């Protein structure tokens, strides 16, 4: 059954991606014949197993916008579990019984109801007594079965979560640092409680079952492990669980602890239940907690240190956050010397003063925080001027939280987005200048305009004393800046951040005008719209950018720092026109995979990120690899060639 469930998941994702690309990008990644073949295979597997996942093309759920989320009272209150931070306490609690130890996932708890094999209701935990009905949203969870091979009524609980990888991908699409989601749990909560489930569908919410609440034959299973295995057979993903006794508890705890950092999903500790269902239920409950389970949170390692200064960090929206700088301490295996205080309210509540003795820890073993101020010498002054631009500041209050803002609309901190884009890999490719580093350089007043980046070598003392920098990293940064002084024209144009002008469009425009900057910068809308793939909107934005006086000054300063790498006016040959390549693995003859990509595009070819029926060649020096791309290429009969074979192909074309 598990093999079939995995194949159902694989087919659902593959067909969904094919439909998305066709509908949103007007291109095909598989032929109609291939699509129909895979569709028929999926439909047959769904009929055999009774499992239909959310997103299945055989049962597409229509999107719907609601005016509100109805509230519903739970049949029985959902109590929290009692907690401990001590492994010996877990062992004592379990005694001589068997237990089920599993992750306490950090998302949003959902109660699902199925009748006659169909998902009919989903309700959030809410306050434990009343939750919100989110059935429409649950129907677009990435891995949730809409139908199951069970005809009676089934009620289960589980956790809706957003994986770290999806969280980072979603945040990467949000340019404003302060608009980014703080953690996967907050993003998940907002996603599950959307009024428009089309938004939920884009968030890749996953559901992991952790409890069977009710079914028609409740006496069918004697242990929780049997319940978990049965839920897996029905098509549910279940929280990872381990059978434990007092003897193997410590060893099992070490297993879970070692996986915290590598897990792709957020967790907030562990939960332990008695495996024997009847025994656990016989224990009853207190007024606050059920007695059949207990939660575990790892004890935070707390260290005492001395507060050295408060750094005021300005951001793109004008928000100025206080950051505590203290004497370095070792926490959870890493050296920590700073922690965000988040806002004025927290800073005032801690009554911080320079030289105070403070205790610090890592929340969830990851994020440094100040736990307490042991000496409380008094409030630090709140700056009346912005540390970046010198403009006036203002304290704004939202509910009970006070935050500091710069009121200058021209504050340099708000330019971080353009700086970050300018140095990115596909633009000027300056390594060592992350957004965080750029923010520090701006905050210290070391860079004000884009051209200032080319003079960071003048600030060795200031930069080498910054956290994360030393002599070596400073030299690497300077070397990277110097290499960036000879860009190709297309990457320079892209680095300017012109609206709607990506690297591919920049290459088309530069090629059209013979890689001549003067011609490119003076192009007209009529000239640009003659280029295939350049429409009126892009052309107008392009021309408008170069006509603005402030942009002319920026470019004038930049041109004093760089010399364009000479390119052939012909822009390469058309040897590879009509051919699509995918590049994977390490390269030997080229500097990196991007260089291979540039060569292919210079000769009229196209490079994509995934192997599809439209791919002509997969370039991989290890053509015997069992990687997913190699497997896919073999399945589709696509040649897998080495770099040398690619070079030979290019020379012979």
UniProtKB/Swiss-Prot annotation:
Organism name: Lachnoclostridium phytofermentans (strain ATCC 700394 / DSM 18823 / ISDg)
Binding-site residues, Zn(2+): 386, 389, 406, 411
Single GO term (MF): DNA ligase (NAD+) activity
Binding site for NAD(+): 32-36, 80-81, 125, 159, 297
Keywords annotated in UniProt: DNA damage, DNA repair, DNA replication, Ligase, Magnesium, Manganese, Metal-binding, NAD, Zinc
Keyword Magnesium found: yes
Role noted for this protein: DNA ligase that catalyzes the formation of phosphodiester linkages between 5'-phosphoryl and 3'-hydroxyl groups in double-stranded DNA using NAD as a coenzyme and as the energy source for the reaction. It is essential for DNA replication and repair of damaged DNA.
Catalytic activity, as annotated: NAD(+) + (deoxyribonucleotide)n-3'-hydroxyl + 5'-phospho-(deoxyribonucleotide)m = (deoxyribonucleotide)n+m + AMP + beta-nicotinamide D-nucleotide
Taxonomy, superkingdom: Bacteria
Biological processes per GO annotation: DNA repair; DNA replication
Matching InterPro entries: BRCT_dom, BRCT_dom_sf, DisA/LigA_HHH, DNA_ligase, DNAligase_adenylation, DNAligase_N, Hlx-hairpin-Hlx_DNA-bd_motif, NA-bd_OB-fold
Enzyme Commission number(s) from the entry: 6.5.1.2
Cofactor(s) named in the record: Mg(2+); Mn(2+)
Protein name, UniProt field: DNA ligase
Protein family membership: Belongs to the NAD-dependent DNA ligase family. LigA subfamily.
Active site: 104 (n6-amp-lysine intermediate)
Every BRCT domain range: 571-653
